[in-house]
Amino acid sequence: MAELNLKQITDKLNSEFASDIRKLVFWYDANAEFQEDIDSIELENAKVLHLEPDNQFYIKYFLEREDTTTNYLVYAPFAKPSIRDNHLADTIRYSKEFFADRASLLTLDLGIDERYKPVIQHYIKFFANKDRTQKFYDLEIENFNRSTIEVALMSVLCKDKTASFEEVLRSILTDDGLQDNKYLAEFEKYDLLSAFWQQADVAFGYNDPKPTLEKLVITMFVTYAAKSIHTDMPQAWKPFISYKFGNIIAFMDNLMNSYLYGTRFDEISEIIYNAINGKNYLEKMEVETLVDCNNFAGVDELLISWIIGRLENEDIGAKLNGKTIPELCVERRKQHFGKNFRSEYFILQNAFDMIAEGKYQPVSGIKNLVKEYTESTYKIDRYYRYFYFYFDKLEDTTQFEKIRELVENIYTNEYLNRITVNWNNELADADGETGLTLQRDFFARHINYSKDRVVVIISDALRFEVAHTLFEKMQADEKCNASIGAMQGVLPSYTPLGMASLLPHKTIEYSPSYDVLVDGKACSSTEQREAILKEYKVNSKCVQFDSMKTMKQADLRSIFTGQDVVYIYHNQIDARGDKAASENEVFTACEEAIEEIYTLIKRVASQANTYHFIVTADHGFIYKRDKIQATDKIAGAASKSNSVGQRYSISAEEIKADGVCHTTVGKVLGSVDERIVSFPLASDIFKVAGAGQNFVHGGCSPQEMLVPMIDVKVDKGKKETSLAEIALVSLTSKITNLITTLDFVQTEPVSDVVKETSYRVYFISDSNEKISNENIVIADKKDKDTTKRMFRLRFNFKNKKYDKSQKYYLVAYDDKNDIEVLRHEIIMDIAFADDFGFFG
């Protein structure tokens, strides 16, 4: 510890004052190295007097007149004056002088070889401060030489806890700017600047007669790019390409993948990109050569621009480096700047899927149509939903407007209109029978005879494709067993009739004023629905989701205690979509609904001892972003109808207009009511006054009529789950090249009991020094085929001397908890490039 320097001094001084004869000891500390420490020196038989340049006469008088018996250490924090200027010269002649060489003391105390004492002496100004000296000690360096001493000094000035040049550079880059950097100013203050540039040369191959921090960082970014861009570098960049690419790649990967410093990396990347005129040079390269480059956000901008061009031309077969557009989108999202372009890549991926699959081909037979929609075609609605979900996150959508128009045209004209017409024609041919359970039979089929407590969550306008996303989320939960099916909804497909159909009943009917009645009773409020439910299930309850959100556990549990059936009414999608001001937020509402329902199920299961849930809806919806022109609306419905909406009309007579279909209320409800329900054949709307025109329901389409039913059972006991593991496939025991690729495999597919995770994979020495770049692996593959879960990683090793007799390891750490999950011993058999001149 630093205190040992003072102990050595104290011991020496105490030995001087050990005799009974009075002694005066003068200590001229030329560099004021011990000015901060002098008062902490504990002398056993003497006192300390502070000598200043202007109090020499007083000190002389004090020592020779006022106190002539006490031993004194006279400390002067300056060099000994010449005899002419030293008024204590005659006193010193009969006293003793003390000399403390801090460099010698430090060298001795730290166990530094005597040959490195000049290094300590060169930087002795650094050690004049007690706090700096202590921090130097705290680094606990084992082997001292010029390099380790200088790096340690820099580490202290950068406030680093370990002596590492990589950490020094990391602090310099992340804690201040590239111009007028405060740490470089500190280095200059203590004469460390040339040492810093020497270290930059040794570690990263940066050597410049007029070095600057900006040029060092340009060297690192250009060298990194040169190893991932598969073409010749621009002439202007070539002087910045370093042969120490392994060290540079390792440092850059660690910095960009750091949770703490990733954002600062992004800022530096932008500065360098502009400084080297990156946009101009990269635009001239073939885009295929840029696919693996991930240290400039500008690369993603160019790739996105290329994908946009392909999709605008509906070129769904386009590939880069053998990768399809969806594969590129997935891969680039996982790269460092993927988080910055997450929305853009999701937009493009969903646009691709829409272009590839959105051109609907009619299906014969309503049962075939139902099967195809519930198994695959629903995904087209999902592609559209997620396209706009991410599109709406962009601040500037200009670049994507042509694709948006293409997606809108395909969805509206080549998919939605076609499938709706196909649906209505096939449904009419089948006399309105899809073969599915009718929504009005829901209670009788699924609730009435349930032996355990069941919670029915009715989410207003939760259409089938949105429910399927929720189902997939439930399925991925190891504590949930979920299945999904569809019911045939009612016409009109709107809230009053849909909610009534889910209640137990003997009859459902319209009053003369077109109110929906269940067993002759109103059913529009929660209280009215609960009264009806209790007539069939005494131990039952109806509650609104919003009233439960902030409940404490005891209050939540009380809702379910003693109940056989609980209906929970959730309204997120319809509440947002039915208002003109917020209808374009409906896809955001869908995501929120999924999360709210999932969280509700988990919460009720864990806090209220209830484990069986059924999620369903009153109806679905149709949503189109572009507003319908007035000329495209079906006129005449409002004047002839007693009850009318944009997608339905109920009246005593048919609406005589092209593109309008009809059925009777009696057919829908199983009664003798002959009133006519009219609805558009395609996805258009009636010309009526009312709310928005983008979000509509009430008509007859798969999106409106196929009501989802998710059956969820939550396990009381937790299943044993594990994280997806990775293993080394390559039979490698020796590394012979600075660039090495290895094959790995994700050992099991992600499932309900095997959860996805991410790993950091790199090489280390026996002393835990990181010797390669760091690869981030996201273990999220679900393929059953093992070969499809294999992947290859590239490692760039530091260009340094490796000892073949020492142990080195390939290691993998779980990125979430920093637990080591893989350690594979290897031999490093690489000839040192600097020795043999392999790289010029």
Located regions from the model:
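…; additionally, a secondary subgroup of soluble metalloenzymes is captured
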Residues: 1-453, 463-613, 617-840
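Ligand-binding pocket scaffold of soluble enzyme catalytic domains
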Residues: 460
